[in-house]
Amino acid sequence: MARTRIAGITVGQAPRTDMTADLESRLAPTLELVQYGALDDLTASEVERDLAPKPGDEVLVSRMRDGSQVTFSGTKVLPLVQERIDQAEREGARAIIVLCTGSFPELRHEVPLVYPQPLFHAAARALAGGRR
């Protein structure tokens, strides 16, 4: 029986086992997590050259496959995130989880797309019990 594919998309490079090992260990046997990274096709030098933040840009930080850290423009990486969403859908993903806690504008998608940030905010509000 084929497993249902769920895509995990990071703004850095995949795989991000530091972020997904716990999640994968809790998935039902009928589910498969396939990871995609917005920066998968780029080297650190290309990220620095092509995605460098300009004054006023939101600055994102992520990891490359080799464990090194890169900083880049949130605006400039969005088209690459969209490309990975499109790829995941073409490859049969039934749902997509964005593996980044930053805020994102609405991205185009055909399957359910989960953004962690609103979930974290809701959990924090619930835990705070109305306190600030």
Regions of interest found by a model, annotated:
Residues M1-A2, E106, R125-A128:
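Solvent-exposed alpha-helices and their adjacent loops that cap or buttress functional pockets
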Residues A2-F72:
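N-terminal glycine-rich anion-binding loop in soluble enzyme alpha/beta folds
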Residues R5-I9, I97, R132:
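Short glycine-rich or small-residue beta-strand-to-loop segments that form or flank ligand, phosphate
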Residues A21-E24, E110-L113, A128:
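Short, glycine/charged-enriched secondary-structure capping and boundary segments
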Residues T71-P118:
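N-terminal glycine-rich phosphate/adenylate-binding segment common to multiple enzyme folds
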Residues V114-R131:
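Hydrophobic alpha-helical segments within soluble ligand-binding/sensing domains
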